[in-house]
Curated annotation (Swiss-Prot):
Its cofactor is pyridoxal 5'-phosphate. The gene is tpa. Its main location: cytoplasm. Pathway: Organosulfur degradation; alkanesulfonate degradation. Involved in an anaerobic respiration pathway that converts the sulfonate taurine (2-aminoethanesulfonate) to ammonia, acetate and sulfide. Catalyzes the initial metabolic reaction of anaerobic taurine degradation, i.e. the transamination reaction between taurine and pyruvate leading to sulfoacetaldehyde and alanine. Is also able to transaminate hypotaurine (2-aminosulfinate), beta-alanine and with low activity cysteine and 3-aminopropanesulfonate in vitro. In addition to pyruvate, 2-oxobutyrate and oxaloacetate can also be used as amino group acceptors. Keywords: Aminotransferase, Cytoplasm, Pyridoxal phosphate, Pyruvate, Transferase. Optimum temperature is 35 degrees Celsius. It comes from Bilophila wadsworthia. The modification N6-(pyridoxal phosphate)lysine is found at residue 280. This is Taurine--pyruvate aminotransferase. It is an enzyme of class 2 (transferase). CDD domains: OAT_like (cd00610). GO terms for biological process: alkanesulfonate catabolic process.
Length: 456
């Protein structure tokens, strides 16, 4: 298909308000085709997409006819009815999803990661009313974690810059320290995970356990720097939650459905959550869908005397009734199963981390390389000894230089002031050895370009 670029750019500038974009002097890029891991722009230039759609979503790659056909077929048969009524793809998808999540039981559908987390917060607060006389409604969140863009989820946001100018926020949310191993105040010690986790207990005791009902965390901090918790961390978090009767919510919006080499990120860490939220990779971006998944125990807290008209979960999501989402999600899971993409993710993830670490000898501004599966971060610093973060302008230039080299990468952005210095990589689970090597080579070239530009 041919396009009139000048016309589209003019219309874009006139009518479109882009996400996360300063529009002063803005020249829009327009992508017109995706196939596998490749994106083609309106000028015909092709890029290797190492960020799965920019925000870590297209887990099984572009151009999946199987998913498109499943959605089209379902839309013709039954496109929508509010989710108080059952439909075939929701039932089948829910069964399939729960089969990947031992210990979990119920699936509640909505439209986005923010919405999925809002549902989790409402569950916690209503349980506080139903079981604790209005107490235990507070929610603890971890510094540098991100859970969404609504006022409620921003109230639980550990990334200060994302919250600027959007307050006042909802009451009853409390922050506890991050799990950044690279910059840990505890240094290198055998029980680092336990020490980091026990910082949660200190906040609980300060706020008061009777005021608190839940803890929410990402399995790996994503947009806050790709932080992988150390051994022993989540086991201790779970023990603390049990001690103070707190529900553990794990936000798998980024890591869920294979991103880290397991179905869910938490499955690397020997921890059983009470609530799991997910979105992005659930349908690989082919249709909007998110899920709030609970244990049977949590679900049963809302199965009460019908005469009590306040005692069930009085919540709805309009597009939680759109059947395209679960139809796409079911096909997405079947592709991951059939093509052994979890195994491929683990293998290619190891190759990616090895390749990136191999660049450290050549590029001294690389302070740390970390990640799990096909989810990796490269923290850039002025000096490895002091770990002083590089200027954000340098990290921004790296993204641009990588694009010039034909590879789309990301970076932490508007997250943690002075620490928006981590490059982010999240290629599709279908990546081959050749794809990984091309990503590493593109980043190597970008580092050389940027180092020369800034005299580093």
């Amino acid at each position: 298909m041919t396009y009139d670029k000048a016309e589209l750019v003019a219309l874009d500038k006139k009518y479109v308000w882009h996400h996360l974009t300063q529009h002063k002097n803005f020249e829009p890029a327009i992508y017109v085709k995706g196939e596998g891991m490749r994106i083609t722009d309106i000028d015909g230039k092709t890029y290797l997409d190492a960020v799965s759609g920019g925000v870590w979503t297209v887990n099984v790659g572009y151009g999946r006819k199987e998913i498109v056909d499943a959605v089209a077929k379902q839309m013709m048969e039954m496109c929508y009815f509010a989710n108080g009524i059952g439909n075939v793809p929701t039932i089948k998808f829910s069964e399939k999803l729960i089969s990947k999540m031992p210990g979990m039981s119920r699936v509640y559908l909505s439209n986005s990661g923010s919405e999925a987390n809002e549902k989790a917060f409402k569950i916690v607060r209503q349980i506080g009313q139903l079981k604790h006389g209005g107490k235990k409604t507070g929610i603890l969140y971890r510094a540098r974690d991100y859970h969404g863009t609504t006022i409620g989820t921003l109230s639980a946001c550990g990334q200060f810059e994302r919250k600027v100018q959007y307050g006042p926020f909802a009451p009853g949310f409390y922050e506890f320290p991050d799990c950044d191993v690279y910059r840990s105040k505890f240094g290198d010690c055998a029980d680092l995970g336990v020490k980091m986790a026990k910082q949660l207990e200190e906040v609980i005791l300060t706020v008061g356990p009777d005021e608190l009902g839940a803890v929410i965390v990402e399995p790996m901090t994503a947009g806050g720097g790709i932080l992988v918790p150390p051994a022993g961390y989540y086991e201790t978090i779970r023990e603390i939650c049990d001690k103070y009767e707190l529900l553990l919510i794990i936000d798998e919006v980024v890591c869920g459905l294979g991103r880290t080499g397991k179905w869910f990120g938490y499955q690397h860490f020997n921890v059983q959550p009470d609530i799991v939220t997910m979105a992005k990779g659930v349908a690989s971006g082919y249709a909007p869908i998110s899920c709030t998944v609970t244990t049977e125990k949590v679900f049963q807290d809302f199965v009460n005397d019908p005469a009590d008209t306040d005692a069930y979960f009085r919540d709805i999501s309009t597009f939680g009734g759109c059947t395209s989402g679960p139809a796409a999600a079911l096909a997405n899971i079947e592709i991951i199963e059939r093509e052994n993409l979890l195994e491929n993710c683990t293998k290619m993830g190891d190759r990616l981390l090895e390749g990136l670490k191999g660049l450290m000898a050549k590029h001294p501004i690389i302070g740390d390389v970390r990640g799990k599966g096909l989810f990796a971060g490269i923290e850039i610093v002025k000096d490895r000894a002091t770990k002083e973060p590089i200027a954000e302008a340098v990290a921004n230039a790296m993204v641009g230089a990588a694009k010039q080299a034909g590879v789309l990468i990301g970076k932490t952005s508007r997250s943690f002031r002075e620490f928006n210095n981590t490059l982010t990589l999240c290629p599709a689970l279908i990546a081959t050895e050749a794809d990984i090597d091309e990503i590493v080579a593109g980043i190597d070239k970008a580092f050389t370009t940027v180092e020369q530009k800034f005299g580093l």
